[in-house]
Amino acid sequence: MSKIKITGTFLDEISHDIPHQNWGKKEWSQDFTYMKQMGIHRVVLIRCGYKNWLTYPSEVLVKQEKAFTPYLDLVSLFLELCEKNQMEFYFGLYDSGRYWTSGNYTEEIRLNKKVIEEVWELYGHSSAFKGWYLSQECNRNAGAIIDLVLGTGRLLQKGFGGKTGVDLTLHRRGEEHFTIHPANRKNNFYKFRPTF
């Protein structure tokens, strides 16, 4: 019987019910070392922010959502640790915790468009930055949530910073998340599909 390898994991720094923001550079560095030792080569930031909590100093979200500026730029740290440990990094978009959950998908898309542009400007240069993760969950009770997924995918399909495009192909997987995955980093061409 062959062993099933675990090659990827989520970084759930901003959480609904788990204490967060209690790790610094030392703790995250040790965690990445352990992940590399066990064969992890892909990490997905489950969300860059949730309501007022952020993983990076977003001017957009501080201004528009009254979010708190974090004491440490975790996105920068995660990218640095990914580069050091030869890991791929996937960026989870912002979860307002209010627009999309109340059916206002247009506002969630509008806000994430600004986040995407800001993040690409700040971190798109990193060799570890490999793609995007759409953190809003799809399930049978979410109504037209597919509009959010399609809208955000189309937004990325048009490109941001004039540097990339997305081949939008949806794969429904029950109540699981979707991600935008690069098919060809060299040509900045992305494919929209599940992460793992």
Label each PLM-derived region with a short phrase:
Residues 2-7, 39-42, 83-89, 125-130, ...:
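Short, well-ordered coil/turn segments that N-cap beta-strands
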Residues 52, 141, 173-174:
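Flexible loop/turn segments at secondary-structure boundaries
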Residues 20-36, 110-122, 176-192:
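Short, acidic/polar
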Residues 19, 72, 76-83, 88-92, ...:
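Active-site-adjacent "subsite" loops/lids of carbohydrate-active enzymes
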Residues 25-37, 41-96, 145-165:
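Aromatic-lined substrate-binding rim segments of carbohydrate-active enzymes
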Residues 10, 88-110, 131-137, 149-182, ...:
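Aromatic-lined carbohydrate-recognition surfaces of secreted/lumenal glycan-active proteins
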Residues 1-45, 126:
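Mature N-terminal, pre-catalytic/accessory segment of carbohydrate-active enzymes
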Residues 12-25, 57-71, 97-110, 133-144, ...:
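The substrate-binding groove and active-site-proximal loops of carbohydrate-active enzymes
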